[in-house]
């Protein structure tokens, strides 16, 4: 279940924080715990374990966040100047202590594309992680990696919703660290199903275009820790117009 940052550190991090990096890398980081696959199409589940950094509805070219005065928009995130849909976006920061297996938030058929870093190397995420773990707060001042780093854009086409949504995986300093479990395109996935892993620190964003048929409501504030396939992030309900249309047909 979703926990405050303090609760998560006390229950999941404190006892292993003093372990060596070698021990953490060998015995802790690559764990893949068994989790139930909940089926609840009244919500989007979290695609990743981690801390909610930000969540908001934005126009395609409006800033999701500003990083030292430089805006970062949906078009920047997806690296697609033609993207034209106002969307609900939720950013989840995966610390070194999190499970790094990603899961499908809502059932659909997945295609993906890998986008190389803008610069020669990826930028590190360590400063953002230190602020979270040591100061128990979120600061985007050192989040230049959002503009620069290698990423995978996963597009999930949902028949039930009548639209696509996106899972954006952003790699940390190491390149080629996003590893899909199935390299084939256009594959069907169930809600909560494992689809990929990211090595070491990383970030996963859930991007849901707004819909004339459904209302999308946020369920948790920034700063909470969530688990992939366990915690619901967005509640889905029919819009009044859609509900009225269904009543008229009935």
Each model region followed by its residue ranges:
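Contiguous, well-folded functional domains in the mature portion of proteins
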Residues: 1-250
């Amino acid at each position: 279940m979703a926990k405050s940052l303090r609760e998560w550190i006390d229950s999941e991090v404190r006892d292993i924080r003093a372990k060596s990096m070698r021990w953490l890398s060998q015995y802790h980081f690559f764990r893949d715990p068994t989790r139930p696959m909940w089926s609840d199409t009244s919500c989007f589940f979290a695609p990743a374990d981690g801390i909610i950094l930000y969540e908001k509805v934005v126009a395609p070219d409006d800033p999701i966040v500003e990083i030292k005065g430089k805006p970062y928009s949906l078009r920047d995130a997806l690296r697609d100047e033609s993207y034209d849909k106002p969307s609900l976006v939720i950013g989840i920061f995966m610390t070194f202590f999190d499970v790094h297996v990603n899961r499908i938030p809502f059932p659909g058929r997945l295609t993906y594309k890998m986008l190389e870093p803008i610069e020669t190397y990826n930028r590190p995420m360590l400063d953002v992680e230190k602020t979270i773990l040591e100061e128990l707060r979120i600061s985007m001042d050192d989040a230049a990696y959002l503009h620069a780093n290698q990423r995978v854009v996963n597009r999930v086409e949902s028949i039930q919703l009548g639209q696509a949504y996106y899972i954006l995986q952003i790699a940390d300093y190491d390149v080629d660290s996003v590893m899909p479990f199935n390299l084939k395109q256009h594959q069907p996935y169930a809600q909560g199903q494992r689809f990929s892993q990211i090595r070491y620190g990383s970030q996963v964003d859930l991007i849901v275009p707004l819909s004339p048929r459904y209302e999308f409501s946020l369920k948790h504030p920034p700063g909470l820790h969530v688990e992939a396939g366990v915690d619901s992030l967005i509640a889905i309900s029919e819009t009044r117009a859609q509900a009225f249309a269904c009543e008229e047909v009935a």
